[in-house]
């Protein structure tokens, strides 16, 4: 594998990476979500893991809402710490204050890489205020000096009833039709 050259169309070389159906689905999902692009994964945990690993580095902190899906909880609390990544949670039912307190607690533990939000939460349907999350994160700096990303898993509502990209111009995860979509903007 190599990077494509200028003015080169990479083509479809390996069906697990890309194929005509997958390409069409990703293009249509990007249009549906009003996003620049989209990526389709085989499972929700593949999308979540890929996104978190893209931003987590040893010594960084991921702040997350709670409760979250069990696989995500295991990744945040058992797997990522083995690689020097700390996770700090807050209950979505605690409102904006709980989120602000989690950010305050995280500040002394390392650079904040990401704010991971599952809203509505599964199985409690707890909601997180995405506009407040954006406001809180706007005053922070991640390990690279940039603002930490906000990652939203909106499995329960999808893009018809909830549009995270309209409120949070970072990443959105949506599981539907037994797949996950990560949409960068």
Q: How would you label these PLM feature ranges?
A:
Residues 1-46, 71-79:
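Conserved N-terminal alpha-helix of the aminotransferase class I/II PLP-enzyme fold
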Residues 37-185:
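Conserved PLP-enzyme active-site core in the AAT-like
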């Amino acid at each position: 594998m190599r990077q494509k050259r200028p003015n080169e169309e990479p083509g479809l070389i390996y069906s697990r990476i890309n194929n005509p159906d997958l390409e069409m689905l990703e293009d249509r999902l990007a249009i549906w979500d009003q996003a620049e692009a989209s990526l389709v994964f085989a499972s929700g945990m593949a999308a979540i893991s890929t996104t978190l690993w893209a931003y987590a580095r040893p010594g960084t902190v991921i702040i997350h809402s709670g409760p979250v899906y069990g696989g995500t909880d295991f990744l945040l609390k058992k797997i990522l710490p083995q690689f020097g990544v700390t996770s700090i949670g807050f209950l979505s039912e605690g409102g904006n204050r709980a989120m602000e307190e989690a950010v305050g607690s995280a500040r002394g533990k390392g650079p904040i890489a990401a704010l991971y939000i599952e809203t509505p939460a599964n199985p409690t349907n707890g909601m997180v205020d995405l506009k407040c999350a954006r406001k809180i994160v706007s005053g922070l700096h991640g390990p690279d000096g940039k603002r930490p990303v906000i990652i939203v898993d909106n499995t329960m509502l999808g893009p018809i009833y909830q549009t995270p990209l309209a409120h949070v111009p970072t990443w959105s995860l949506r599981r539907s039709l037994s797949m996950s979509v990560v949409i960068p903007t």
